[in-house]
Amino acid sequence: MKLWEADGHKVIAHLTNGHVVVGMADCYTSEQDEPDGVASIIIGDGLFFENQIESIELA
């Protein structure tokens, strides 16, 4: 699943550090709009960058 497709859905994200985050995905920001050039999304109350997410799926 692409990161932008998760926006507005409850998701399960497997992070590169081994943690798993479950929550509503919101506020997708493309790499073009991020200062560091890496897309991001809010899941629950945390902000995650695309390079921190190993995989993401609908919950």
Question: Predicted regions span which residues?
Answer:
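Conserved RNA-binding domains used in RNP assembly and mRNA/RNA metabolism
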Residues: 1-59
